Amino acid sequence: MNKYELVYILKSNVEEEKRNQLLDKFRGIIEADGTIENVDEWGNRRLAYEINKINEGYYTLVNFSAAADVPKELDRNLKIADEVIRHMIIRLEK
């Protein structure tokens, strides 16, 4: 299993209940064939630049270990979610 780091930014007006639902959805995808090591919610922050006329976003960092196919499925689900402004998944060095 490889180690990965996921950062995703949600629209800042998303309610806490919806944020938790999304985190649970992403957590389910990861835990189907991996383990979550850490979830760090950074909260609302100003974006470095405007994205689709949005200036603020809710940042979340997730560190996890998983099989090689998990990031592809996670990426697909992050792209589909309307509340996600941006996301990035990187593989960490061994």
UniProtKB/Swiss-Prot annotation:
Binds together with bS18 to 16S ribosomal RNA. PROSITE patterns: RIBOSOMAL_S6 (PS01048). InterPro entries: Ribosomal_bS6, Ribosomal_bS6_CS, Ribosomal_bS6_sf, Ribosomal_S6_plastid/chlpt, Transl_elong_EF1B/ribsomal_bS6. GO terms for cellular component: cytoplasm; ribonucleoprotein complex; ribosome. One of its GO terms (molecular function) is structural constituent of ribosome. One of its GO terms (biological process) is translation. Pfam families: Ribosomal_S6. It comes from Alkaliphilus oremlandii (strain OhILAs). This is Small ribosomal subunit protein bS6. Belongs to the bacterial ribosomal protein bS6 family. Keywords: Ribonucleoprotein, Ribosomal protein, RNA-binding, rRNA-binding.
